[in-house]
Every structure is written in C-alpha cells, then in structure tokens.
Amino acid sequence: MKKLFSILSVACLTLFPSCNDWLNVTPQGQIEAEDLYTTTKGCNSVVGGIYYTLTSSALYGQTLSYGLMDVLAQYWDLSTIPDHNYYNATQYDYTDQNVIGTFNNVWSNMYQAITQCNAFIYYSEPYKENIANYDLLLGEVYGLRALAHMELFEIFGPVIHTTADLQKPAIAYRTNYNNVSQGFDTGEVVLQKAADDLNRAL
C-alpha cells in the first residue's frame, strides 16, 4: 500500500509541476492591470469604467438625477410619506443618518470617478502612440474630471452671493494620481482648474 501511495505521489508531482500556467487564465471581460493603459481596448475599458462609476445609483443613476437633488429642489412632495428614505431630506434634517449616508456616497463615488480620471491621465500618457483616438479619449477624461469637480462644488461648496464668496474654501480639486491628502481649494481656484480641464478637453 505504501509503495502504491509513493508511486501515485511521484506521478502527480511529475504530471502537474506547472499547473499554475494552465490554471491562471484571465476571465473573459477582464484585462490584466499592466495591459489596461497600454492598448486601445484597455483604455476604452478604463473610460467605460469612469462612466460606469458616474452612472451608479449613488450618482447619476439616481441621487443626482431624480433622487436626493430633486427632493431638495422640492420636485417631490414626500410630506405625507414619513417612512420614505428621503423624508428627512424634505424636512432639511441633515443630521439624519440616511441623508448623511447619501451625501457621503455622492462624495466618495464622485472622488472615485475623479481618481479613475487621474489614473487614466497618469498611466496612459507613455503609451499614447499605441492607442487609437488617444486625444479623443484624453479630452473626454479631462471633461469628465471637470464635470465631477463642478458637481461636487455645486453640492458641497459655499453658496456664492458675491465674488468674495469665491475666496472661501470649497472642495479639493484633485489633478494628481496619488493618495496624498489635499486641502480644500477656494471656489475661485476650483473654477479656474475646471476651466483649465475643459480647455484641455478641447
């Protein structure tokens, strides 16, 4: 019995020494990280991923199109539905956990989209000669980055009554792909950086 076990063990070891090679298969629809920014297909996938993030229910898939923003604009009358998720928002109760959670989701998901834009700009530039329609994709990403920052500025920035209000801290306009904490820019700086991104997009 021991002899049979030894023979089977040796046979298994010699037959399957490199099973990692044939078990390590990339699933269809996925691209290796190192290939993402070096090919047209990869760059198209990255830009598609930015749109996917923006269309999540936390952003334009609901909250920013017909959800919380419409409730705050009083397009929906929820005053008779106190158990609705947005009821406390209609009462301008910004301490409610549902309202706080919704705003936090907008903040984090929008900055996730901005990070995706910054990653595209940072990683794809060395391979731009290999990527079809690179300038078009790059312009699209700069435009999306400006859009995302302007949406955050509109929601979380100070109310602008006079030009002096543009000197107040608003949001962090992130243009670098890193995890370094960044202080808030003034409204004036945010508007200038957004204009710069839109000019690059052209």
Give the role of each language-model region:
Residues 155-192:
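Short coil/linker segments at helix-helix boundaries
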